[in-house]
């Protein structure tokens, strides 16, 4: 026991022996500077305790070991009621936020879907005026595509709830009254699901690489059909799939459980896309993506096609990722923080000028976010709300 305490003490203050990283996001805790005042008023002591909780040596080792014991021996879910992960049938894991949206089915406020669709329509028109292709890609929710793997109480919705029209359905209906190039990947996944190939991994919350590749192919088709995108290169077709061990986002929910070994679903092979030979093209494409975490796998899918160019991804309009596609690999620079909201930074960002493609990507559960306000801000910046000569100079 003394050896264990010594290791914990050394790990806390010296960083040796090294700890293991934990999955998930935690709020950073800092300790105030020790002064007579902070000592006497208790501020220092109050801050040290949460700091020790986060920085205790071998904390990660202890948490993973406790979670492994509780899961393996006692069949208890790690994290208890506070966890964001839900255990489903046959080793499938789900993120609670997506299950909650499925069971509550929140809708837009009156006329909200129509207003968002109108903003997207105006944004597409403005993009076309500048020779830029535009499309909206609505990513599906795993809980909506594979409800049969949810825990039994959540598999079938009560008739009254199932009859409700949620925000995603409202927006799709509103967009059908416009000319907006919209790829409804929810509907596409339900169609492709009948082919018998998994489109989501059991251990992850995002679409797998095979599903993302097919979604990209559908979105690229919608982009190339636009008059401003005739020169876009043809991407290699998805010829099939092969099974491989899950990697990266295939197991992002497994990583959140903080176990030493993956759950059974996290060890199951997942489909990976097989592409036809890439058509020869010297075109270098500049793509701007705005959206949520489903776009990361789309960028991976783009890199597999052999396309050359650059991708600027504005993640939730708060962080800017710049990716260079060389035709054989992708090179990603360190992300740039855009602030708490970042609308002004994104709207006036020089990387938007001269892009060939603007792609808005969001999961269906974020439909009511209205693109995090960016479509409306881009339209306002380019339509004379304020000084169009300044605000619209770098905006579509």
Q: What is the role of each PLM region?
A:
Residues 1-396:
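Extracellular glycan-modifying ectodomains
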């Amino acid at each position: 026991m003394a050896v264990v305490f010594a290791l914990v003490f050394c790990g806390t203050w010296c960083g040796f022996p090294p700890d293991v990283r934990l999955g998930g996001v935690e709020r950073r805790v800092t300790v105030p500077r020790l002064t007579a005042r902070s000592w006497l008023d208790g501020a220092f002591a109050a801050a040290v305790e949460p700091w020790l909780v986060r920085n205790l040596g071998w904390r990660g080792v202890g948490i993973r070991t406790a979670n492994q014991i509780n899961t393996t021996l006692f069949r208890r879910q790690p994290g208890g009621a506070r966890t964001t992960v839900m255990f489903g049938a046959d080793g499938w894991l789900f993120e609670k936020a997506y299950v909650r949206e499925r069971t509550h089915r929140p809708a837009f406020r009156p006329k909200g879907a129509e207003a968002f669709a109108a903003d997207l329509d105006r944004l597409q028109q403005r993009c076309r005026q500048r020779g830029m292709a535009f499309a909206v890609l609505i990513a599906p929710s795993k809980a909506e595509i594979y409800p049969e793997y949810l825990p039994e109480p959540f598999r079938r919705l009560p008739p009254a709830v199932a009859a409700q029209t949620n925000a995603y359905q409202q927006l799709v209906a509103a967009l059908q009254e416009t000319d907006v190039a919209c790829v409804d990947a929810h509907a596409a996944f339900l169609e492709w699901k009948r082919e018998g190939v998994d489109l989501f991994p059991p251990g992850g919350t995002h679409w797998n690489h095979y599903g993302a590749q097919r979604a990209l192919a559908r979105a690229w088709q919608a982009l190339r059909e636009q008059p401003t995108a005739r020169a876009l290169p043809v991407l290699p077709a998805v010829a099939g799939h092969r099974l491989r061990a899950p990697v990266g986002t295939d197991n992002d929910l497994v990583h959140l459980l903080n176990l030493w070994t993956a759950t059974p679903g996290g060890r199951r092979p997942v489909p990976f896309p097989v592409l036809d030979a890439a058509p020869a093209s010297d075109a270098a494409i500049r793509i701007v993506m705005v959206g949520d975490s489903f776009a990361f796998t789309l960028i991976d899918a783009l890199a597999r096609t052999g396309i050359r160019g650059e991708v600027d991804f504005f993640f939730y309009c708060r962080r800017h990722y710049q990716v260079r596609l060389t035709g054989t690999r992708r090179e990603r620079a360190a992300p740039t923080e855009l602030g708490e909201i970042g609308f002004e930074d994104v709207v006036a960002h020089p990387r938007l000028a001269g892009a060939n493609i603007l792609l808005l990507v969001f999961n269906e559960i974020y439909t009511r976010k209205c693109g995090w306000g960016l479509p409306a801000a881009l339209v306002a910046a380019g339509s004379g709300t304020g000084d169009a000569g300044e605000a619209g100079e770098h905006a579509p």
